[in-house]
């Protein structure tokens, strides 16, 4: 569907889950980046979310650490220019280690950029994550990469995790924003353990 705004996206997503699972069926919910912000806001809608896991969630409202200005890939005139723009943007925004920027990562990133149906950039800076987490009372895991440029993980640990007994924060060393791609060997077991409870 076409979404007019973030709130309508959250409402439609929550309604779809209720329709598919029923209003009282417990389920676990996870999201990455903007999907983490959406997941937190869906969980705040009163659904039967047992446990929530957010990987490098957007919408925190805290400081960012830019690594480089993103290239406008829509201006690419050739396949080579598009490939180079995507490679650079992965380095500048998503992945810390150069060797992780492989054809598979570039392919996923390119497909996602070309096929996105919702422009999230302006929403991710609005600070909508904290209020949603304050409403959702269940266990919440947030995983950040140490070099995530979309945030300052230590700052968020202090402001979103400390003093919140239902929240757990993990900062993974030597990875960037796309933690679930760049370090699946560490992220996958963390998620399996989190949702196994």
PLM regions and their residue ranges:
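Flexible "cap/lid" loop of the alpha/beta hydrolase fold
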Residues: 37-44, 50-81
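Conserved alpha/beta-hydrolase catalytic His-Asp/Glu region
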Residues: 65, 80-138
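Conserved loop-alpha-helix segment in the C-terminal half of the alpha/beta-hydrolase fold
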Residues: 141-175
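Active-site loop/oxyanion-hole signature of alpha/beta-hydrolase fold enzymes
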Residues: 1-30, 45, 189
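Conserved catalytic-core motifs of eukaryotic protein kinase domains, centered on the activation segment
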Residues: 1-2, 64-66, 153-154
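Catalytic nucleophile loop
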Residues: 31, 35-36
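Catalytic active-site module of serine/aspartate enzymes centered on a nucleophile-bearing elbow/loop
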Residues: 165-197
């Amino acid at each position: 569907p076409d979404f007019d705004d973030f709130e309508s996206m959250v409402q439609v997503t929550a309604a779809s889950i209720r329709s598919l699972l029923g209003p009282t069926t417990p389920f676990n919910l996870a999201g990455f980046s903007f999907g983490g912000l959406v997941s937190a806001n869906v969980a705040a809608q009163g659904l039967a979310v047992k446990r929530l896991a957010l990987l490098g969630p957007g919408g925190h409202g805290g400081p960012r650490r830019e690594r480089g200005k993103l290239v406008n890939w829509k201006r690419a005139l050739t396949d080579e220019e598009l490939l180079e723009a995507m490679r650079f943007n992965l380095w500048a925004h998503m992945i810390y280690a150069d060797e992780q920027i492989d054809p598979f990562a570039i392919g996923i990133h390119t497909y996602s950029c070309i096929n996105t149906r919702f422009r999230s950039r302006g929403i991710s800076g609005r600070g909508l994550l904290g209020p949603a987490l304050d409403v959702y009372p269940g266990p919440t895991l947030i995983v950040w990469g140490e070099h995530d440029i979309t945030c300052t993980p230590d700052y968020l640990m202090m402001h979103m995790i400390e003093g919140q007994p239902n929240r757990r924060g993990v900062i993974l060393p030597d990875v960037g924003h796309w933690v679930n791609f760049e370090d699946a060997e560490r992220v996958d077991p963390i998620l399996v353990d989190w949702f196994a409870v």
